[in-house]
């Protein structure tokens, strides 16, 4: 195919999800494109779901990855914001229509023509491959400026996990100093939700089924309180005390007990994605004027705002850096929940033979 450039990534070729070196092509650098050498890529749980086709729409070979930080190696002649050598980020999506109401209002995430960092179809009909690769080519609009004082690799998961928790806090008004926020789940999303909430000046209660996480939540992450959700005495005392709750848990679980923790007008925002329907007592919500909301990652403008906010307040993820030769072991550990709190792949230093 004309105007394609060879590169190398790590792809799954079937639903086993096993990742191996894979040579493929990306488009040549267009006039509005930024080409970057990938330095680091975060490992999101959705990557694991997708390489195993657990969502049902994976096409193989599949190069996953949507939390990418790299260094600019080439720019198109119409690119204005970046030059060769800049550190930049790439997140969950890499293109949108640019014209719909969502795009005009800087919430490209909800554009009906959104193109994801992998598994979407590019303009030339090829399948877009993700950040577990040596290079990427992205339109300038969807590339993020990376602050010099934001550490690598620990900042990398902000592009996915960070945006996922920051965006609903801003949209639903859960960013006002003095508010009381509950955070359900203390994983990759939850630990960043605690950090952002504390930077906003919120009182934070971590809600978990695991009593063993109390010390970590309070003494390491800075939460103000810890609630064991299976402890009836604790939950009784916490009823009607929270202005909002960010629920980061993807495993199916009951939501109604969480609503009891909210004050009247409180908001339960679900950012995890359970794969089973949930039951709601609508009358209970009506009587307390309580809201169930959802959210995905922020748009381009908001994600850049989040990155800059994180740099200003020293917010990064707690990460374990993984060499690419150990990527499949990392995926096995992720499936077991054996990570604190996020894996980041060291792609820049990887050597690969195809």
UniProtKB/Swiss-Prot annotation:
Q: Which GO BP terms sit in this record? A: alkaloid metabolic process
Q: Which domain of life is it from?
A: Eukaryota
Oxidoreductase recorded as keyword: yes
Would the keyword Glycoprotein turn up in this protein's UniProt record?
Answer: no
Pathway noted in the entry: Alkaloid biosynthesis
Q: Where does NAD(+) bind?
A: 45-49, 185-190, 214, 271-273, 295-297, 340
Catalytic activities: 3,17-didehydrostemmadenine + NADPH + H2O = (16S)-deshydroxymethyl-stemmadenine + formate + NADP(+); 3,17-didehydrostemmadenine + NADPH + H2O = (16R)-deshydroxymethyl-stemmadenine + formate + NADP(+); 17-dehydrostemmadenine + NADP(+) = 3,17-didehydrostemmadenine + NADPH
Task: List keywords of the entry alphabetically.
Answer: Alkaloid metabolism, Metal-binding, NAD, Oxidoreductase, Zinc
Without the gene, what phenotype results? Reduced accumulation of catharanthine and vindoline, but accumulation of akuammicine and short-lived MIA.
**Cross-referenced CDD domains:** CAD1
Q: How is the cofactor bound?
A: Binds 2 Zn(2+) ions per subunit.
Task: Identify the cofactor(s).
Answer: Zn(2+)
- The enzyme's main class, written as a single word, is oxidoreductase
Residues that hold Zn(2+) 2 according to the record? 97, 100, 103, 111
Any one Gene Ontology molecular-function term assigned to this protein's record: zinc ion binding
The record ties this protein, via Pfam families, to: ADH_N, ADH_zinc_N
Q: What is its EC number?
A: 1.5.1.56
Let me know which tissues express this protein, per UniProt. Answer: Expressed in leaf epidermis.
Q: Where does Zn(2+) 1 bind?
A: 44, 66
* Similarity annotation: Belongs to the zinc-containing alcohol dehydrogenase family.
Role: Component of iboga and aspidosperma monoterpenoid indole alkaloids (MIAs, e.g. tabersonine and catharanthine) biosynthesis pathway from 19E-geissoschizine. Catalyzes the first oxidation step of the unstable intermediate product resulting from the reaction triggered by the geissoschizine oxidase (GO) in the stemmadenine biosynthesis process from 19E-geissoschizine.
The protein in question is named Protein REDOX 1
Organism whose genome encodes this protein:
Catharanthus roseus
Gene name of the encoded protein:
Redox1
């Amino acid at each position: 195919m004309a105007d394609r450039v060879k590169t190398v990534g790590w792809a799954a070729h079937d639903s086993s999800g096993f990742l191996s070196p894979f040579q493929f092509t990306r488009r040549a650098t267009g006039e509005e494109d930024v080409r970057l050498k990938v330095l680091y890529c975060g490992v999101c749980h959705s990557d694991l779901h997708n390489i195993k086709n657990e969502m049902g729409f994976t096409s193989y070979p599949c190069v996953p990855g949507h939390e990418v930080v790299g260094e600019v190696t080439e720019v198109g002649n119409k690119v204005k914001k970046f030059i060769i050598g800049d550190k930049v980020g790439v997140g969950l999506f890499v293109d949108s229509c640019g014209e719909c109401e969502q795009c005009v209002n800087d919430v490209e995430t909800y554009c009906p023509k959104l193109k994801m960092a992998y598994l979407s179809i590019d303009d030339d009909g090829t399948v877009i491959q993700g950040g577990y690769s040596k290079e990427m080519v992205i339109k300038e609009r969807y590339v993020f400026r990376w602050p010099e004082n934001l550490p690598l690799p620990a900042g990398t998961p902000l592009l996915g996990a960070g945006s996922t928790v920051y965006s609903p806090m801003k949209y639903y008004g859960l960013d006002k100093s003095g508010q009381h926020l509950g955070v359900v789940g203390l994983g990759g999303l939850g630990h960043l939700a605690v950090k952002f909430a504390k930077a906003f000046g919120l009182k934070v209660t971590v809600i978990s089924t695991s009593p063993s996480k109390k010390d970590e939540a309070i003494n390491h992450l800075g939460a103000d309180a810890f609630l064991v959700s299976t402890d009836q005495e604790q939950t009784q005392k916490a009823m009607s005390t929270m202005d909002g709750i960010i629920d980061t848990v993807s495993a199916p679980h009951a939501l109604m007990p969480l609503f009891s923790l909210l004050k009247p007008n409180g908001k339960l925002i679900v950012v995890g994605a359970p794969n089973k329907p949930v039951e709601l007592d609508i009358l209970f919500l009506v009587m307390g004027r309580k809201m169930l909301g959802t959210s995905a990652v922020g748009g381009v403008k908001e994600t850049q705002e989040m990155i800059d906010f994180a740099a200003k307040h020293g917010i990064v993820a707690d990460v374990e850096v993984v060499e690419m030769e150990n990527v499949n072991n990392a995926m096995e550990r992720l499936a077991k929940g054996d990570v604190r709190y996020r894996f980041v792949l060291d792609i820049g230093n990887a050597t690969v033979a195809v």
